[in-house]
């Protein structure tokens, strides 16, 4: 064949899988539904396939919250537009910053005119993928307000919630609701250097659910 008919291959890119593993020991918010799996059929005489049934909270592992999670009249995750979950993003390190991510913890990395519309913050040195962390780091609501002011449409974090684990008001979630942002939680950013990437973290089309698992990846810009 004529080589002119074939466009040049793009340069190779690195892919970071930033999804938490999901299994029976995956940590969940106290009282939430852990992952479990039962086999409905197994390969053997007269059965050519393995088929399982799984039960889990949609907040197990890396996930996207729907407005329905923090707003009684909010949209389910299956009705949330997908645009926010794919596109340019910035990974910011605020490791060991304390209970709340304040603007001072991230200003060095987000205070520029080229800030992408998606910001993911790493707070752990190593994310605890096999235990619940009741002292997790959350976003200060004022930080989300200022990110929204700068055009950010999605915020992410490597902890289980953008609010403190014992919060009864979910102040940061309420900023998300009021400003129309999207949120990703339980991301694994342990191996990801700070910088700009392409985020792909699409939720399932669960038409009545308050959240959805995502297979979140980052792709390095060529």
What are these regions (language model features)?
Residues 2-222:
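Active-/binding-site microenvironments in catalytic and ligand-binding cores
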């Amino acid at each position: 064949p004529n080589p002119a008919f074939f466009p040049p291959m793009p340069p190779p890119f690195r892919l970071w899988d930033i999804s938490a593993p999901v299994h029976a020991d995956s940590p969940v918010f106290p009282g939430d539904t852990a992952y479990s799996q039962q086999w409905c059929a197994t390969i053997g005489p007269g059965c050519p396939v393995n088929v399982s049934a799984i039960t889990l909270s949609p907040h197990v592992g890396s996930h996207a919250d729907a407005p329905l999670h923090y707003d009684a009249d909010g949209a389910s995750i299956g009705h949330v537009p997908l645009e926010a979950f794919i596109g340019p993003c910035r990974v910011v390190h605020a490791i060991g910053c304390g209970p709340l991510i304040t603007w001072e913890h991230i200003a060095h990395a987000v205070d520029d005119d080229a800030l992408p519309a998606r910001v993911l913050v790493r707070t752990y040195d190593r994310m605890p993928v096999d235990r619940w962390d009741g002292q997790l780091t959350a976003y200060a609501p004022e930080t989300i307000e200022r990110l929204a002011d700068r055009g950010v449409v999605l915020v992410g974090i490597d902890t289980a919630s953008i609010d403190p684990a014992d919060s009864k008001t979910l102040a940061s979630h309420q900023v998300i609701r009021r400003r129309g942002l999207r949120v990703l939680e339980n991301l694994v950013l342990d191996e990801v250097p700070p910088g700009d990437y392409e985020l792909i973290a699409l939720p399932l089309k669960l038409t009545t659910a308050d959240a959805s698992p995502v297979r979140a990846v980052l792709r390095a810009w060529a």
